[in-house]
């Protein structure tokens, strides 16, 4: 589902003149362990803890995360590219959120990673985008409290998303639970 949504998003972006590709998607436990150890070896453990996930805690191991790079603007910072602007404006329509936004490090626990997008499904992505919250904040406020279906109101997104957003089920909330960490 996430891979299909990403392909659909890339095709739409190309149609709008924005070009990007997935640099990193799924990463195995062993590959994540090796990546973290390499980062820690060359940069120190405190740097690695703030900038990478240990094995077993990476969103990339879920198959729901993708790091994006601009195809034709490689000399620029990703945040200065047309690809980034397109993703900021459109990714939620395809079920993706910018997982670690700038200025929210104290909330997410990670250094800003503007190229790291997480698939959470269209309904949740659009609700998160409309709320202006990080995914961690949105999950804690609106998704996690409704584990008991009997306690969940008809629509937990009605005050925080556009009128077209549909209610989010407990199953969607559980599937969309944030991972402990990024890349």
Predicted regions and their residues:
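Ser/Thr/Gly/Pro-rich low-complexity, disordered linker/stalk segments of secreted
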Residues: 152-183
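Cell-envelope/glycan interface and biosynthesis
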Residues: 1-160
């Amino acid at each position: 589902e996430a891979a299909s949504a990403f392909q659909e998003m890339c095709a739409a972006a190309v149609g709008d003149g924005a070009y990007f590709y997935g640099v990193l998607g799924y990463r195995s436990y062993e590959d994540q362990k090796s990546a973290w150890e390499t980062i820690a070896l060359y940069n120190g453990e405190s740097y690695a803890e703030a900038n990478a996930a240990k094995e077993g805690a990476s969103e990339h191991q879920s198959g729901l995360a993708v790091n994006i790079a601009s195809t034709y603007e490689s000399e620029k910072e990703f945040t200065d590219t047309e690809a980034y602007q397109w993703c900021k404006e459109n990714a939620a329509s395809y079920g993706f959120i910018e997982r670690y936004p700038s200025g929210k490090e104290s909330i997410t626990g990670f250094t800003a990673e503007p190229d790291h997008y997480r698939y959470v499904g269209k309904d949740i992505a659009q609700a998160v985008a409309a709320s202006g919250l990080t995914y961690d904040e949105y999950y804690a406020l609106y998704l996690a409290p409704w584990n008991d279906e009997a306690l969940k109101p008809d629509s937990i997104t009605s005050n925080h998303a556009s009128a077209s957003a549909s209610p989010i089920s407990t199953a969607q909330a559980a599937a969309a639970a944030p991972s402990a960490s990024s890349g």
